[in-house]
Amino acid sequence: MVKRVQLVLTKDVSKLGRSGDLVDVAPGYARNYLIPQSLATHATPGILKQVERRREQERQRQLELRQQALEQKESLEKVGSLKIAKQVGENEAIFGTVTSQDVADAIQAATSQEVDRRGITIPDIGKLGTYKAEIKLFSDVTAQIDIEVVAS
């Protein structure tokens, strides 16, 4: 029978777990590596209560963020179409391309809402016309918005 020690991780440890996880490890691993490196502490009843309280707070925070994302999605989809003006060459081909930063700036101007440009997915836009952009607001909340590229 192998003895195991219960620890609560204080930092992320590769191949073991994330900060706040309750893990069972060999006593030598705990005594010689995890505890001296301040990567974990012994799982006492008080620490387990703290961990549970932190998890509940994180759960509540995630629910609030998701609710805010849903509200932001509704307001973004009410906007309809965003107009982005670009210089045009022959055959309605635009100079450069429309970037996610351009879309984020257009959203900021139209709705005064900050949107992270890294969450915006747009197709390759090289000509004038109407395109669909997908904006990821939360892990499972995505808004669709029309982008109209017009000549400046």
Swiss-Prot record:
Give the domain of life: Bacteria
What InterPro entries does the annotation carry?
Answer: Ribosomal_bL9, Ribosomal_bL9/RNase_H1_N, Ribosomal_bL9_bac/chp, Ribosomal_bL9_C, Ribosomal_bL9_C_sf, Ribosomal_bL9_N, Ribosomal_bL9_N_sf
The positions making up the signal sequence are: none
| Name of encoding gene | rplI
Its GO CC terms are: ribonucleoprotein complex; ribosome
Instruction: Report the GO molecular function annotations.
Output: rRNA binding; structural constituent of ribosome
Q: Which NCBIfam families match?
A: L9
From the Swiss-Prot or TrEMBL record, give the protein name.
Large ribosomal subunit protein bL9
Q: Which organism is it from?
A: Nostoc sp. (strain PCC 7120 / SAG 25.82 / UTEX 2576)
Q: Does the keyword rRNA-binding apply?
A: yes
Q: What family does the Swiss-Prot or TrEMBL record give for this protein?
A: Belongs to the bacterial ribosomal protein bL9 family.
Q: Which GO terms describe its biological process?
A: translation
User: Function, please?
Assistant: Binds to the 23S rRNA.
> Which controlled-vocabulary keywords does the entry list?
Ribonucleoprotein, Ribosomal protein, RNA-binding, rRNA-binding
